[in-house]
Curated annotation (Swiss-Prot):
It holds the Pfam family Defensin_propep. Residues 20-62 form a propeptide. Belongs to the alpha-defensin family. It comes from Cavia porcellus (Guinea pig). One of its GO terms (cellular component) is extracellular space. Keywords: Antibiotic, Antimicrobial, Antiviral defense, Defensin, Disulfide bond, Fungicide, Secreted, Signal. The lineage of its organism: Eukaryota, Metazoa, Chordata, Craniata, Vertebrata. It comes from the Eukaryota. This is Neutrophil cationic peptide 2. Has antibiotic, anti-fungi and antiviral activity. Its main location: secreted.
Amino acid sequence: MRTVPLFAACLLLTLMAQAEPLPRAADHSDTKMKGDREDHVAVISFWEEESTSLQDAGAGAGRRCICTTRTCRFPYRRLGTCLFQNRVYTFCC
C-alpha cells in the first residue's frame, strides 16, 4: 500500500530532474542588462605549504586571496592579476 505513493513520488522527482527549466521572463533579463556591469569575485584559499611559487608572490599558506574587478580593499593588497573565463581580474591577498 505504501509502495504506490513512494513510486509516484520517485517518478515525479525523476521527471522534474529531467525537465528543462522554464525560460526567464523578459522583464527580468531587461533589468539585468540595464544595470551596470557586475563586480565578479572569485575567492581562492591557499592552504598548502608546497606551493612555493605562490609563497614567493606573497600568497602564504592559509592566506585568503581573491580575484576581483575592483581595487583591493583592506586588509587585502594587490599581488598581480588573475585570468578567469578570458577576463583579467585583480589578484588580492
